[in-house]
Amino acid sequence: MNFKVFLLAASTIAVGLVELIVGGILPQIANDLDISIVSAGQLISVFALGYAVSGPLLLALTAKIERKRLYLIALFVFFLSNLVAYFSPNFATLMVSRVLAAMSTGLIVVLSLTIAPKIVAPEYRARAIGIIFMGFSSAIALGVPLGILISDSFGWRILFLGIGLLALISMLIISIFFERIPAEKMIPFREQLKTIGNLKIASSHLVTMFTLAGHYTLYAYFAPFLEETLHLSSFWVSICYFLFGISAVCGGPFGGALSDRLGSFKSILLVTGSFAIIMFLLPLSTSSMIFFLPVMVIWGLLSWSLAPAQQSYLIEIAPDSSDIQQSFNTSALQVGIALGSAIGGVVLDQTGTVVSTAWCGGSIVIIAVLFAFISLTRPVQTAKKSSL
């Protein structure tokens, strides 16, 4: 495996932190800015929507820019966004910082995902993608629990300053170890958008969207879930986040290896089906930590196991527009996060109990399984692809 893949993954740790760390510190942000937990949860939704909209659009607008230079520019904007978050005097300013962070993150992740599979042998393609997503999941394992502990001692703002410093380190690493990466000739953006009209491709993106929507219906409010069901202190909540994160870190490589071994077809069905089952088991296991922890670990493993298979699948069925399809898929992932966070907030507000978010989340993942069957059973329209 090319060591540069791991360097790209290291860069995604910083950008993963800024998105994922907020879920663990919602109570602190809400208290400091005098807003409700549900309102604070919008920080997750706004980031996800900003990422989803800007990712494909910025990729198209910057198609002619040399990729290393673009990567460094995106990292610098990301650094500035974290400074804005650190100094934000109110909720509105913090929201602005989230939009800036989302736009730069969208470019950084898509560039990482498009570069990584091109610098490894074809048989390692899914694993390379899995390693990139391992950077995101590492942010859960290390950042979220440490973020909870650090914010309890020094406040939540210091976290964004630290993430900004990580972005500067990433800029240094990329500038030293990567040579110029010429921009490749791309199909016009308007033509690439037309591929979404292909039911096989569109359904694949919907699998990602509904899987993440189901996941984040609960995960966006995981800290309150642990406090309500298991009556855990902040320390033990951070421990659970850490254990979840460790399993999620393993999810990316596991999903990549599974896809390379079984093929993307079987992997997608296996992961989505298992994910739906585990979502329904989560609230049933909260009678004891002995029952809950194994279920939670499996949940964490599966949460990042789908992405490598999905990205590899899209490269297989749409090779002529694979770059933009990977961007669309990460956008679908972010739309799912935003949708799930919003649905979780509504469910929590209407029912008054965070436990109901797990039941709702599991039901949403079932929709993802149905779309997986639709996509996987449709033939590849080679003629249509070649016309692009």
Curated annotation (Swiss-Prot):
Question: What parts of the sequence cross the membrane?
Answer: 5-25, 43-63, 72-92, 99-119, 129-149, 158-178, 206-226, 235-255, 262-282, 289-309, 328-348, 354-374
One GO term in the molecular function aspect is: transmembrane transporter activity
Q: What induces it?
A: Up-regulated by adenine, via the adenine-dependent riboswitch. Also up-regulated by hypoxanthine and guanine.
Q: Indicate yes or no for the key word Cell membrane.
A: yes
Membrane topology label: Multi-pass membrane protein
Under the heading InterPro entries, the entry gives:
MFS, MFS_dom, MFS_Efflux_Transporters, MFS_trans_sf
- A single BP term in Gene Ontology: transmembrane transport
GO cellular component terms, A-Z: plasma membrane
* Protein transport recorded as keyword: no
Q: What does this protein do?
A: Involved in the efflux of purine ribonucleosides, such as guanosine, adenosine and inosine, as well as purine bases guanine, adenine and hypoxanthine, and purine base analogs 2,6-diaminopurine, 6-mercaptopurine and 2-fluoroadenine. Therefore plays a role in maintaining the cellular purine base pools and protecting cells against toxic purine base analogs. Modulates expression of the purR and G-box regulons.
Q: What is this protein called?
A: Purine efflux pump PbuE
Organism annotation? Bacillus subtilis (strain 168)
